[in-house]
């Protein structure tokens, strides 16, 4: 608590928050950089060690427990090791999976007044559409029911308020313009490395921006045990910017004097560490160990750590206003000050109802009108920026308070993030889980390297007294290496001591021949240990070899899928927290866009999912009237559907359930709801085409049946006419024969018919007429039956067509 005693008092009227008061707040923050005051965050050194480990740099002090578990001071303990980043591949697997996960969101209006207005607009529009359908008498009952069902589906699933439509299109536009998925992917890497994921939303040049915050460069104060960065009462961001970036960001608030200071800043550390009286400021060189962490032991007293190696590769000092690369130190402070507001009770002059409104502290209460007042002290987000040691800009209340209409005290700084901790404790990140195994792997691999270097194989013992006279060792090694001959001279006389003048071969100096230095078994043991360490790391992290794509030949497809699925369950908690951070960050970005667009119209080309563009214009004042929230669908079913989309699309293409163009759009669309609408629309079009084809087929069949009926009727008519002509011919012949004389052509005389013959002829004619009448009746019956059969067929075809359309 003593560290905050020097912080200026915040419960002051706005008139007393002078420029000097604001500078004092920033100067207090200038003394607190690099320190860790959060109860749920790891120290900066701990995070720096993790980041360096992923970048291939080892902190040997962090390996002491592995290299020297007994704490023995010995020269054989190595002071440097070669690092083998076996954990990086597992982190990259998760990073790749994050980039492919579905994050399907939809912007909705959340404030109650706007929701009521949306309900009224939806109701009025629905009633208008229903009235138009009722008054339209040209449609049948079946068509009316179909349109009513479509209308119900539209207003249930697809209808959106115009503000929600604009918010969705605006957010999708900025997501593509800023490549926000890549920003989130980098933040997910921070979460796996140090257990923190933080983003900042702000307004730069009149445009809303979102950036990832480096966990090494942010200090959080007074956040309690909350794992949300938004709950902090004070945040310090410390970074080194190039002079060009400083001017780009603050050009509208920098004076010519400030620009001159930036152009003439010092360019070496000694110039800043010594003041005008040649006094050395020791704060620039060392930091109190108690404020850092327990990762590095104290040496030479309390002050030990040189922060010059924290930010970059030894060219920056976190307490200097510049670094050796020509960059300026930019210190940004965000804190919650106190503001007095008045809650005034008044009465509507027309209805007499009570009304409550909030006013600033300088509001004059009109007691004659019956106004009553209550005063409250609420939180107000402030900001300030210190550039170098002399430039102070933007010391003011935040332009964006990120508060809600129902709570004027709720606010934050536009810095959104989460600590991946458990039960109010400090985070234990994925890198922290795997780091001991990677250290052990490096130590064992160092032994393996030394064992391989010392594995000389079989060594020949050489007695120099037997080397032939006049030969040196190099010549002898040449014959042994090239000719594989070990030459000895047993008659060479000794030259030293008691052996002088004696033959070397007569001495009892027979060598042992070969010395075996082969340590292959030891090397194999080290290799087995390395494989064991990899397996243990995979089990602890929950990232199996199958998930990394390392599959042996004996594994089955089902076994690999099961192993991958179980592995994904272990790491799902990381993605759950990450999706929540993404949701809050996008909501914060929308709030930032509201203030950035207020007072002007935003006209932009909205980039659709298929890379086509659409011009959209948004009224900033109307857009800022509502509060917005995100509805996210990232359930397991959604993720599984995304994974199976390839198989389903291929099956749909083979069965011609979907068109090829629709399948290509499915892969370019990022919204699951849009994919469902594309599939439903294409299925509807295919059904309509199939129904139209069936209708045309039925019409063709009906035409063929009609033509066949006409042909059959023509044949019957022709047959009837032929029968009539034949009968008439027979009657005429009979009449001629009955009335005519003898046939003289053939010279045969035929007597006249007798009465009996005439009677027989008349009887035959009568029988023929009756038979002709029966044939006519039968022909009429056949014709009527054919018409009935054709009518039945037409009705059956119509019934089949209507059933297919339904």
From Swiss-Prot:
Residues 795-806 have a biased composition (Basic residues). Residues 337-380 are annotated as: Interaction with Cargo protein 1. Residues 783-806 are annotated as: Disordered. Keywords: Capsid protein, Viral capsid assembly, Viral genome packaging, Viral release from host cell, Virion. This is Portal protein. Residues 783-792 have a biased composition (Basic and acidic residues). Forms the portal vertex of the capsid. Probably involved in head assembly, genome packaging, tail attachment, and genome ejection. GO terms for cellular component: viral capsid. Its main location: virion. It comes from the Viruses. It is found in: Virion. It comes from Bacteroides phage crAss001 (Bacteroides phage PhiCrAss001). Homododecamer. Interacts with the Cargo protein 1. Interacts with the major capsid protein.
């Amino acid at each position: 608590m003593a560290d905050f005693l020097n912080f200026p008092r915040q419960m002051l009227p706005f008139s007393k928050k002078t420029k000097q008061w604001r500078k004092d707040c920033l100067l207090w923050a200038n003394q607190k950089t690099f320190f860790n005051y959060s109860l749920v965050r790891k120290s900066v050194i701990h995070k720096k060690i993790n980041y360096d480990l992923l970048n291939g740099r080892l902190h040997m002090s962090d390996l002491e427990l592995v290299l020297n578990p007994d704490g023995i001071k010995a020269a054989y303990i190595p002071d440097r090791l070669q690092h083998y980043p076996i954990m990086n591949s597992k982190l990259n697997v998760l990073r790749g999976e994050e980039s492919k996960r579905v994050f399907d969101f939809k912007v909705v209006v959340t404030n109650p007044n706007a929701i009521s207005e949306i309900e009224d607009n939806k109701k009025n529009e629905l009633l208008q559409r229903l009235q138009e359908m009722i008054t339209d008498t040209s449609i049948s009952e079946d068509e009316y029911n179909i349109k009513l069902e479509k209308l119900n589906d539209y207003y249930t699933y697809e209808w959106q308020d115009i503000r929600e439509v604009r918010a969705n299109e605006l957010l999708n536009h900025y997501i593509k313009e800023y490549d926000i998925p890549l920003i989130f992917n980098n933040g997910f890497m921070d979460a796996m490395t140090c257990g923190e994921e933080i983003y900042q939303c702000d307004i730069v040049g009149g445009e809303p921006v979102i950036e990832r915050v480096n966990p090494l460069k942010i200090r959080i104060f007074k956040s309690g045990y909350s794992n949300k960065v938004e709950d902090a009462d004070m945040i310090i961001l410390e970074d080194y910017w190039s002079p060009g970036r400083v001017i780009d960001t603050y050009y509208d608030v920098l004076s010519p004097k400030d620009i001159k200071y930036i152009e003439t800043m010092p360019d070496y550390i000694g110039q800043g560490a010594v003041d005008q009286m040649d006094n050395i400021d020791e704060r620039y060189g060392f930091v109190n160990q108690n404020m850092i962490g327990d990762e590095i032991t104290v040496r030479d007293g309390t002050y030990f750590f040189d922060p010059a190696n924290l930010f970059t590769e030894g060219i920056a000092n976190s307490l200097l206003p510049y670094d050796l690369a020509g960059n300026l130190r930019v210190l940004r402070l965000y804190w919650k000050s106190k503001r007095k507001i008045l809650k005034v009770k008044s009465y509507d002059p027309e209805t007499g109802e009570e009304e409550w409104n909030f006013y600033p502290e300088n509001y004059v209460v009109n007691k004659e009108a019956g106004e009553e007042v209550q005063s409250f002290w609420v939180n107000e987000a402030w900001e300030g920026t210190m550039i170098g040691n002399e430039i102070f800009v933007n010391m003011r209340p935040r332009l964006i308070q990120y508060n809600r209409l129902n709570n004027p005290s709720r606010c934050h700084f536009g810095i959104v993030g989460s600590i991946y901790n458990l039960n109010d404790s400090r985070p234990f990140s994925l890198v922290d889980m795997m780091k001991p195994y990677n250290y052990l792997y490096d130590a064992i691999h160092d032994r393996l390297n030394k064992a391989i270097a010392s594995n000389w194989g079989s060594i020949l013992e050489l007695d120099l007294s037997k080397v032939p006279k006049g030969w040196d060792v190099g010549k002898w090694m040449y014959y042994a290496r090239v000719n594989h001959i070990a030459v000895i001279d047993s008659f060479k006389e000794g030259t030293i001591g008691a052996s002088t003048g004696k033959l070397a071969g007569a001495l009892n100096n027979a060598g042992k021949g070969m010395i075996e230095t082969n340590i292959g078994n030891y090397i194999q043991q080290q290799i087995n240990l390395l494989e064991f360490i990899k397996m243990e790391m995979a089990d602890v992290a929950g990232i199996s070899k199958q998930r990394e794509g390392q599959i042996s030949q004996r594994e089955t497809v089902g076994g690999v899928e099961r192993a991958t699925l179980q592995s994904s369950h272990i790491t799902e908690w990381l993605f759950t927290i990450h999706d929540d951070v993404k949701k809050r960050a996008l909501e914060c970005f929308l709030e930032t866009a509201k203030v950035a667009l207020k007072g002007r119209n935003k006209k932009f080309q909205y980039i659709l999912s298929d890379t086509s563009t659409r011009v959209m214009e948004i009224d900033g004042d109307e857009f800022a009237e509502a509060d917005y929230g995100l509805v996210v669908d990232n359930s397991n079913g959604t993720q599984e559907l995304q994974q199976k989309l390839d198989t389903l699309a291929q099956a749909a293409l083979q069965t011609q359930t979907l068109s090829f163009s629709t399948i290509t759009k499915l892969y370019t669309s990022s919204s699951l709801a849009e994919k469902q609408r594309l599939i439903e629309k294409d299925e509807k079009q295919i059904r309509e085409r199939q129904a139209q084809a069936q209708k045309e087929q039925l019409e063709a069949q009906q035409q063929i049946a009609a033509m066949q009926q006409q042909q059959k009727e023509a044949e019957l008519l022709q047959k009837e006419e032929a029968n009539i002509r034949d009968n008439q011919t027979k009657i005429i012949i009979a009449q001629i024969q009955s009335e005519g004389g003898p046939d003289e052509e053939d010279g045969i005389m035929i007597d006249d018919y007798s009465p009996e013959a005439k009677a027989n002829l008349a009887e035959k004619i009568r029988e023929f007429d009756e038979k002709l009448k029966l044939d006519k009746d039968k022909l009429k019956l056949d014709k009527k039956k054919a018409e009935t059969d054709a009518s039945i067929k037409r009705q059956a075809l119509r019934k089949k067509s209507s059933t297919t359309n339904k």
